[in-house]
Amino acid sequence: MILNTGARTDTVQYYSEWLLNRFKEGFVLTRNPLFPDKVTRYELTPDKIDLVLFCSKNYAPILPRLREITDKYPVYFYYTITPYGKDIEPGVPSVLESIETLKRLSAIVGRNRVAWRYDPVLLTSKYTIELHAKAFAYMAEKLAPYIDRCIFSFVELYKKLTINMPELIPMTESDKRKIADFLGKTAKHYGIRIQTCGTNGDYSEFGIHSSGCAVLSELGKANHCEFKDIKHKGMREGCHCIENRDIGAYDTCPNGCKYCYANKNPQAAMLNYQKHNPQSPLLLGEVKDTDTIIQGVQRSYLKSKYPQLSLFDMELSLIHISEPTRPEPIS
């Protein structure tokens, strides 16, 4: 089974102790968001978990103890760093701080297991196409030696977002092509593989790939293991990722990002965060007498057992971190 720790909330930034406790105890419970009295149990043992996916905007809280997970499981990390300020992402560290944290993460796990998400790309009177071009070039120069690839998507104008962000400027196809053009050129200049995620549209002419952000071939290569060749069903429309199971909960992320789809409102998320018990098998709340607990299906995608990395392998994956070669900035 592919375990996802960060699709519904920023587990790493706010619930690291809980996550580490779950791995230590060897199981986790997750409540069905549509049927709250239905609870699924997943075993978190190496024989049941093929790989652990992380997605966060701040890995600093878990870095001191990260090896408790990475020494036992194949892993892959998505680090979201965007140019938005506190007006849009009030709970997210600054770009400079995030870049330094990503470097530390990369030093621990190897650049081959770290992807930078520049996501979502949105436009307002403040965050213009020109600002994105400058910000992306700056970040790409700093991050290139420490990442496996870059993933981006254009913001989706769902109904709640138009209410939360009335300042949002709808993107035309011309806008998207302009953005894709400079993203592709900048990524190529710094030697970064760049791809879309869950975005309809073909931008291959700009050197942008359209593969899913979590595909077995890439995850296997990053972890020196081999997965079966199976169809990737995706997690939503336009998604080409492998099916995975998330153990988080909606309405629990205090980051307060205005574009977030996982929170109904920031106030509810903050209240839930304050009620969190790191000793509970559930991220939010406790098991109730009325709950029905079922054993989750944990299908393995591995073709062969995961081999432990040798020190030689780790040195090879980290070689570009110690002596990064950087091209000259785009003038």
Residue ranges with predicted function:
Residues E97-I163, D181-G198:
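Conserved C-terminal portion of the radical SAM core fold
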Residues M1-I88, E100-S106, R111, P266-L316:
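Conserved Radical SAM active-site core
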Residues R8-D10, K57, T80-Y84, D119-L123, ...:
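Active-site beta-loop-alpha junctions enriched in small/polar residues
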Residues R245-K264:
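Local cysteine-cluster metal-coordination motifs and their immediate loop/turn environment
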Residues A187-M235, G256, N263-E315:
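Peripheral terminal and linker regions in Fe-S/redox and tRNA-modifying enzymes
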Residues I319-S331:
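Single conserved hydrophobic/aromatic residue that forms the stacking wall/gate
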Residues Y84-V92, P120-E130, N164-M171:
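Surface-exposed cleft-lining segments at the edges of enzyme active sites
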Residues I147-Y250:
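Catalytic cores of enzyme domains
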